[in-house]
Amino acid sequence: MLSCNICGETVTSEPDMKAHLIVHMESEIICPFCKLSGVNYDEMCFHIETAHFEQNTLERNFERINTVQYGTSDNKKDNTLQCGMEVNSSILSGCASNHPKNSAQNLTKDSTLKHEGFYSENLTESRKFLKSREKQSSLTEIKGSVYETTYSPPECPFCGKIEEHSEDMETHVKTKHANLLDIPLEDCDQPLYDCPMCGLICTNYHILQEHVDLHLEENSFQQGMDRVQCSGDLQLAHQLQQEEDRKRRSEESRQEIEEFQKLQRQYGLDNSGGYKQQQLRNMEIEVNRGRMPPSEFHRRKADMMESLALGFDDGKTKTSGIIEALHRYYQNAATDVRRVWLSSVVDHFHSSLGDKGWGCGYRNFQMLLSSLLQNDAYNDCLKGMLIPCIPKIQSMIEDAWKEGFDPQGASQLNNRLQGTKAWIGACEVYILLTSLRVKCHIVDFHKSTGPLGTHPRLFEWILNYYSSEGEGSPKVVCTSKPPIYLQHQGHSRTVIGIEEKKNRTLCLLILDPGCPSREMQKLLKQDIEASSLKQLRKSMGNLKHKQYQILAVEGALSLEEKLARRQASQVFTAEKIP
């Protein structure tokens, strides 16, 4: 009896089979499960094995390897039709069979891993079997008028072994792969083993172990991929960090350059010219805006050039007679003031178009020098001297550096002041006065000594500096003490006296070089209004900068004292309070 591989019909002889096959060749092949048509036999077999694996398995019971030989008594060798091994797809049911009742329940639930009826205990054997099924179409070879093919020896669907005869192959499968062909019955006591990783049920412990090993290999591969991914992530993170660091350094470098240029502009070291260039530039702006006639521009320019050539201040920013006016005011008014101490006579100098924004230190030096020039105690060291203009003051400070005073400060300013808008502070005024043999010293109030950032110790020091008489002294004391140079961050002013209120609070009297002449002229009126003194009076609450420095003049120096102070200025120090 011969069985058709296409439809399963059984015929009795080879001629009937050939005729039956011709019918299949002439008719359209239709899938018995989904009615697919229009494909050849090999494609239909592949379609059924892949798309209808479960249905095909449930519909047919397990069939053993079929080997059919056809032969005649006359010529058995030439007329042999070998329908090579057909391993029904249901053979996969025997690879590692689940319990029947479990397979029936899970048929519609789990098609991803267990394959509902594909109860394989050995994934490796299953893969080999699928390969053998792909080859099956080429292994089935029929000699005759229908197919002109050659005989191909049978191959084991599980391990790939090739035998010469089908009987040998059947024996091989039964002996070597008997465990894969066993189908556990519903009521048998065969032990079942669950995969701890995917839940697959196996009937053989060794097959389960191999199955689990496949899981472990897969996990190991995934871990390796994770490590590669992790290594790539670390490298990417390192590259991103390097790029971020590079951008940060570039940004810091850019900000540093900008800050340095800002400081250069702030302290007048940006090579934009000095007093002369700024004066001319600002006067040109005034002319362009219509605030200054061209004739006035040329007149002022000529006066400036003459002043610079002589090295003396032209006096156009000076206001004299302030101490005298204050003395009259306190004698006749100021009923809330208990006592007041005033410095020696001093002139006020305010900033001009040539030094606006940076010349406060120079103007305060002019105020202090104006007081010293009117004090007989300093005639010897300042004999024949006039108030210098700002470029001349810069030249005098450079000369003091050349003598050896304060080399560190000179280095910070590149040993150059002329032609720049560089600020000067208490240190530069100190070395200039010392080079002129004027005795002075600097006191550094480096932190606040009172509540809310105030400096009561500063007020006490200035009071002690000016006061020298007891309770019996008059209300207004005009001392012979020169004004005090007062420096803080970004600005400097001149202290010309101190008030003591009836409630014992203290108030400094301060001249500001930023105050224009028209405001100072209000103090020279016969009847000074109390509001006019508002620009001079500074209470403790008005002085809240973090640090203050004062420079106080104490007399004249001998030549030996000057040399000693020059040597001491190599490492500049100041008295600190507290």
Curated annotation (Swiss-Prot):
The cellular component terms of Gene Ontology attached to this UniProt record, alphabetical and capped at eight, are: cytosol; nucleoplasm
Q: Name one GO molecular function term.
A: zinc ion binding
Q: Which residues carry this modification: N6-acetyllysine?
A: K262
Q: Which reaction does it catalyse?
A: Thiol-dependent hydrolysis of ester, thioester, amide, peptide and isopeptide bonds formed by the C-terminal Gly of ubiquitin (a 76-residue protein attached to proteins as an intracellular targeting signal)
Region zUBD/ZHA, as annotated, extends over 249-274
Mapped zinc finger ranges (C2H2-type): 2-24, 29-52, 154-177, 193-215
The record lists the effect of D406A as:
Loss of catalytic activity
Show the active-site residues. Answer: C360 (nucleophile), H491 (proton acceptor), D512
So what does mutating C360A actually do? Loss of catalytic activity
Q: Which keywords accompany this UniProt record?
A: Acetylation, Cytoplasm, Hydrolase, Metal-binding, Nucleus, Repeat, Zinc, Zinc-finger
InterPro entries this protein is in? UfSP1/2_DUB_cat, Zinc_finger/UBP_domain, Znf_C2H2_type
Superkingdom of the source species: Eukaryota
Q: Name one Pfam family in it.
A: Peptidase_C78
Q: Does the keyword rRNA-binding apply?
A: no
**Residue numbers spanned by region MIU:** 226-248
Location of the protein in the cell: Cytoplasm; Nucleus
EC numbers, comma separated: 3.4.19.12
- What does the sequence similarity comment in the record state about its family? Belongs to the peptidase C78 family. ZUFSP subfamily.
Q: Domain note for this entry?
A: The motif interacting with ubiquitin (MIU) and ZUFSP ubiquitin-binding domain (zUBD, also called ZUFSP helical arm ZHA) are responsible for binding the distal (outgoing) ubiquitin units S1 and S2 respectively.
Q: Write down what this protein is called.
A: Zinc finger-containing ubiquitin peptidase 1
Recorded source organism is Homo sapiens (Human)
Q: What is the lineage of its organism?
A: Eukaryota, Metazoa, Chordata, Craniata, Vertebrata
